[in-house]
Amino acid sequence: MKKIRCALIGSGNIGTDLIYKIQRSPVLEPVWMVGIDPESEGLARAREMGLKTTAAGVDGLLPHVLEDNIQIAFDATSAYVHAENSRKLNELGVMMIDLTPAAIGPLCVPPVNLKEHTEKLEMNVNMISCAGQATIPIVHAISRIQSVSYGEIVASLASKSIGPGTRANLDEFTYTTSNAIEIVGGARKGKALAIINPADPPMMMRNTISCLTDEEPDEPRIIESVLAMIKEVQKYVPGYRLVNGPLFDGKRVTVFMEVAGLGDYLPKYAGNLDIMTAAATRTAEMFAEEILAGTIQLKPVEMAV
């Protein structure tokens, strides 16, 4: 079966984990890995796995895009450089899946709103953050039953799983995730907090999701909705697990989740990597299926959507 050829930009934890996810895909093929440090472990790993590599950043990839028929690129660099990366690749007709918190394209959480993005051609979609991918499905599961005035999430992440790129973007991470709790999750006001946990051995990714409903919570319907949503996420992140809840205290609904990774690049505690890379892969697959079916055609654009 024909596959859509992909480039990965950023050779850190997220970019390297992505190679494994994309290699398993029936419709995606990883061809290029782009970095800026010739000595980086990610570039070495990519070469071992048969990818072409460049340490000259996106500019090192541009001359090869057309001859290698690259149609989808994943940006796992930093919010600070994403807009420029996206512009250069969009001009060549490459669709961008943004794994930074830059959020210049529409925000995407696969089980919540992926379908509406694939129906209209977007040349740049944003995956929000690992915390967003782990928690917004639950906020949405509650808000689709009844209105939510406030949604707050706390994500606890193992320090060893957080690379320099994510650390440099923590402010953007917080802002973009808070915004997405409102736009995608459906809460009128959203707040996101990230805790980087230095414990050794590293702890699994943990997420606490709290929502305040306008009316008294309809407990049976909320429980049913949350459990159904967890099953949807588990289709692409098998380690997504309910620890406790939904718990009800007046109008407050609280859900405790844990995310174990598949252990592709980093060990299983790094569920935050997995939920991000799996969501990005799932998103790219949906677009790839449409491209292969001929229902959408990528076109060069002057500026990202």
UniProtKB/Swiss-Prot annotation:
It catalyses: acetaldehyde + NAD(+) + CoA = acetyl-CoA + NADH + H(+). Keywords: Aromatic hydrocarbons catabolism, NAD, Oxidoreductase. Pfam families: AcetDehyd-dimer (PF09290), Semialdhyde_dh (PF01118). One of its GO terms (biological process) is catabolic process. Its EC number is 1.2.1.10. GO terms for molecular function: acetaldehyde dehydrogenase (acetylating) activity; NAD binding. Belongs to the acetaldehyde dehydrogenase family. This is Acetaldehyde dehydrogenase 5. It comes from Dechloromonas aromatica (strain RCB).
